[in-house]
Amino acid sequence: WIINEAIKLEKNVINLYNSYSYHKAVQNIHNFCVNELGGIYLDIVKDRLYTCSADSQARRSCQTSLDVLLNILIRLIAPVLSYTAEEIWQLSSNLINQEKSVFLSKFSSRKNTKDTKISSLEWDRIFEIKDSVNQSIEEMRNNNELKGSLDAIVNIEVNTDDFLILD
């Protein structure tokens, strides 16, 4: 999901740069980092990064996604945050297909987002369910019934359609 969202962002930002709408490009990058990346994805995967063993598939999958995201975001910020982008590029020696400088690299030539088994409407429903669960957990934490979200045991009752999405 997050990589598809980043690919959509990349296409949109490149179009905005090509039309000299730099302020809109920066706004789109900022909104992605705040909403999708910080507000959803990192919140979901942070526990996986902290608790899974270093060689677990769940953790490695997350690290690979973060590497792809970093690669996309560095290229997108380079036209407006030149020194910052170059410094990150130089310090990130493990980036995929890394040139000597971010300015020698090209924007991606991805034509389409990757096909996924889950539609955007289904993702919206998943996030609605996630928000409902998080709200319940937060209420339990406020009532001192729970120390943290990792202590929660969650049972979700859903209809058939939601079950098929969550399965």
Predicted regions and their residues:
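Aromatic-lined ligand-binding clefts that engage carbohydrates, nucleic acids, or primary amines
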Residues: 26-30
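Short helix-adjacent coil turns
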Residues: 17-24
